[in-house]
């Protein structure tokens, strides 16, 4: 199965790029989206310097995080150059 990688703009204004997995069984109000290898995008910087792991490794070593899809304002397909840099940085 191919990874689904998207740019997510969250309601709090953060912009992330991440692999996304859907949770098949969940309770209403519980997280229903898994982000794998999420990275924060600093839109003021170029792709090489504008991606940082999210949350920071000083906070957790986990590479997966669950969120409510309600926290996502929109999702878009990443620009090919952004996708390429993301794949380099997570490998």
Language-model segments: residues:
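Conserved RNA-binding domains used in RNP assembly and mRNA/RNA metabolism
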Residues: 1-91
